[in-house]
Amino acid sequence: MFRTLMNAKIHRARVTEANLDYVGSITIDEDILDAVGIVANEKVQVVNNHNGARFETYVIPGERGSGVFCLNGAAARLVQKGDVIIVISYVLVPEEKIAAHRPKIAIMDENNRIVQLIAEEPAHTVL
């Protein structure tokens, strides 16, 4: 049996742009993607901390070092520039490997820079 577990999380990134006329997806700084192991075209869930919206889309790598988090297409209606979001990817893990699974979690600052990389959810609130 397989379980769906969190594989990567980008916590408290700020939306830098919303582009309604683009075909679709979320564009994320490729350095940040590399840090948490999310790849181009990977399906992700996006959670908007400002309005509670949750939606799925896929990832397009953005310019390295830019800090870009741009929601494209229809998803652009669910965010505004400056909103704080969480981006989560999931993976199917065989039951026998669950105990060894460690997600990669990037805690972001207000400029979309990684301030901490952790391998498990903290037991307290992280801002």
Swiss-Prot record:
GO terms for molecular function: aspartate 1-decarboxylase activity. Pfam families: Asp_decarbox (PF02261). Its cofactor is pyruvate. Is synthesized initially as an inactive proenzyme, which is activated by self-cleavage at a specific serine bond to produce a beta-subunit with a hydroxyl group at its C-terminus and an alpha-subunit with a pyruvoyl group at its N-terminus. The keyword Lyase applies. The keyword Signal does not apply. It catalyses: L-aspartate + H(+) = beta-alanine + CO2. One of its GO terms (biological process) is pantothenate biosynthetic process. Pathway: Cofactor biosynthesis; (R)-pantothenate biosynthesis; beta-alanine from L-aspartate: step 1/1. The active site is at 25 (schiff-base intermediate with substrate), 58 (proton donor). It comes from the Bacteria. Keywords: Autocatalytic cleavage, Cytoplasm, Decarboxylase, Lyase, Pantothenate biosynthesis, Pyruvate, Schiff base, Zymogen. It is found in: Cytoplasm. Binds 1 pyruvoyl group covalently per subunit. The modification Pyruvic acid (Ser) is found at residue 25. GO terms for cellular component: cytosol. Its EC number is 4.1.1.11. Substrate binds at residues 57, 73-75. Catalyzes the pyruvoyl-dependent decarboxylation of aspartate to produce beta-alanine. Heterooctamer of four alpha and four beta subunits. Belongs to the PanD family. This is Aspartate 1-decarboxylase. It comes from Geobacillus kaustophilus (strain HTA426).
